[in-house]
């Protein structure tokens, strides 16, 4: 189901997960080829907790779905996914996936960056902190780069955030366990398949 309303700040956990992608570092694989890397992330609007993230050679719908599936399996189902109008996000498959897991999708209006401000701000932080500290000569596989990113995200989630009244994103996210709507593993597997079918 697709919605068309203007998002305001959502203070409740699992009300909204905002997803986006960003160009990451360039990875030189063992065959000597240099590859552009994409980072796909999902952030909980209320807590700034990174619920899903991964690195890929391609920025596409299938890779986005894998991030969404892992996040839903681990952290529950948000009421709303907030995405931009890119082809990886705005399609019938996305609407079908959201409906299957009991969620909905909002697509940000063009040229309104405030609707995705938190995830875009997080990507800037990631680049300033994680990417700026990488020596890419140490990385030749996605798996190794992924491990480094996961370590950074874990540290970020546990650091006190200036907007959370002295709490970390992790503390804020897990402060309201009654908000979590969990799906059985078999339900997730049935709902998120490649490609989705009606």
Language model segments and positions:
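Residues immediately flanking
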Residues: 21, 45, 85
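A short acidic/small-residue loop/turn micro-motif
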Residues: 56-60
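RNase H-like two-metal-ion nuclease catalytic core shared by retroviral integrases
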Residues: 81-85, 89-100, 105-131, 140-146
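A generic secondary-structure signal for well-formed alpha-helical elements
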Residues: 72-75, 105, 126, 130-134, ...
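A conserved active-site cap/scaffold subdomain adjacent to cofactor or substrate pockets
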Residues: 141-158, 162
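Short small-residue beta-strand/loop micro-motif enriched in glycine and branched aliphatics
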Residues: 48-52, 106-108
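Mobile-element integrase/transposase regions
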Residues: 1-41, 49-50, 61-67, 74-79, ...
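C-terminal, beta-rich DNA-binding module of retroviral/retroelements integrases
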Residues: 158-198
């Amino acid at each position: 189901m697709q919605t068309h309303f203007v998002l305001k700040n959502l203070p409740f956990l699992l009300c909204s997960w905002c997803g986006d992608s960003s160009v990451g570092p360039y990875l030189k694989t063992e065959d000597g080829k240099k590859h552009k890397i994409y980072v796909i992330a999902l952030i909980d609007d209320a807590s700034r907790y990174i619920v899903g993230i991964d690195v890929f050679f391609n920025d596409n719908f299938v890779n986005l779905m894998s991030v969404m599936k892992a996040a839903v399996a681990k952290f529950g189902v948000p009421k709303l996914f907030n995405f931009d109008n890119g082809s990886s996000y705005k399609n019938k498959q996305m609407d079908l996936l959201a409906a299957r897991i009991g969620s909905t999708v909002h697509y940000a209006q063009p040229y309104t960056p405030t609707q995705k401000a938190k995830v875009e701000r997080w990507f800037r932080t990631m680049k300033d902190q994680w990417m700026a500290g990488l020596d890419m000569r140490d990385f030749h596989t996605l798996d190794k780069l992924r491990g480094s990113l996961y370590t950074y995200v874990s540290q970020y989630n546990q650091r006190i955030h200036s907007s959370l009244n002295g709490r970390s994103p992790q503390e804020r996210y897990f402060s309201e366990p009654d908000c979590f709507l969990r799906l059985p593993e078999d339900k997730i597997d049935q709902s998120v398949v490649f490609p989705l079918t009606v």
